[in-house]
Curated annotation (Swiss-Prot):
This is Sigma54-dependent transcriptional regulator SfnR. It comes from Pseudomonas fluorescens (strain Pf0-1). SMART domains: AAA. Transmembrane segments: none annotated. The gene is sfnR. Residues 21-250 form the Sigma-54 factor interaction domain.
Amino acid sequence: MQLLTLPPSPALATSIRATAQVFEDPKSQALLAHLQQVAPSEASVLIIGETGTGKELVARHIHNLSNRRNRPFIAVNCGAFSESLVEAELFGHEKGAFTGALSAKAGWFEEADGGTLFLDEIGDLPMAIQVKLLRVLQEREVVRLGSRKSIPIDVRVLAATNVQLEKAINAGHFREDLYYRLNVVNLELSPLRDRPGDILPLTRHFIEAYSQRLGYGRVTISPGAEHKLRGYSWPGNIRELENVIHHTLLICRNGVIERDDLRLSNLRIDRPDDQHATADDSPEALLERAFQKLFEQQAGALHEKVEDALLRSAYRFCHYNQVHTASLLGLSRNVTRTRLIKIGELAVNKRRPTENLQGERLIQLSI
C-alpha cells in the first residue's frame, strides 16, 4: 500500500487531478447529483472505473460532502506494497513485531480515525488480508501486528477497483462476503471518451493549475488544439489528459497552446470487456475520426473528394449496379451515372450523350 498524498506541504498534499471537480458532461453531472445523496450517509462505497477515470477524486468529493469533512482523508494504494507489509501498513504494528520494527506504528485505519479511508485497487489485496479487513469492517476495531489488544476505530471506508470483482470472486481471488460489505453503494465511472463534455473543462483546469505551479502567466488554447483534444479517445483517461497538458505547457510558446504542441499517444488499448468500447467504434464515430484526419492534413477540395469516395465505395458495395447505388445514396440514376463517369468508375457510352448535369450536386455534406 502507498499513501497517495505524500507531499509535506498542505498546499501540495493532493494532486492537481485529485482536486479537479470541474465536470460539465451530463453523465458526470448525474453522478455528482447521486453523490450529493449518498455522501452524508455512513455507508461503504465501491467505486468502479478504468485507471485514471478519477476514482480518488470521487472519493474525496464524497468525503468533502460528508459529516467527516473536517476529519482526515487517507488514500492508500493496496497494490503498492509487498504482501508481507500489507498487514502492518493497514492495521499497524508493535515494536519488535517483525525484523526492522524498531518502534510501534499506527496503521492507516488508526490514522483515518474519525474520517475516511480510501482503499484504491482493493482487488489487489491478498486473500489473507481480505479476511482481516472484513473483520475490521464488521467489528470496527483493529489489532496491530504483534499485539492482542483491540483498538476501536471510527472510519468510513471507500474502496475502488479497475477490475470486475465478480470475475475475481468466481476465480477465487476475492472474497464474496467482503465484496458485499464494501458494495453497499456502487458507483461506476465512465471513461473519459464516453463523457466528452468533461474534456475541455478539465483541460482548462489543468492549464490554470500547472501554469500557476510553473510560474507562467495566462495561457490559452487555440480552437485547433481544442478540436484535437475532443477527437482523441483518451485510453489513459483523466490521468493521461493531465500529463498531456503538463507536457504541453513545458514546450508551448507565446502563451498559446497550438495543435502541434499536443503530443497524443498512438497506443491503442483493447478492452474486450468494456461495455463502452462499442459506442466509440460506431460507424459514425469512425467516419468522424476519418474526417478529422482529413481536416488535419488541410487538403483542398475536401467536399468533392469526400463525394467521390462515397460514390466509389457505394458503387463497389452494390457490386457495380447503378440502380442499387442510386437507391442506396438517395440519388437519381442520371446523377449517379454522370458522377461515376467523372470519377472513372464507368466508361462513357458514345452512342448516348451524357446528360448535362453541370449545376447538379451529388450530395450535400456538412463537414
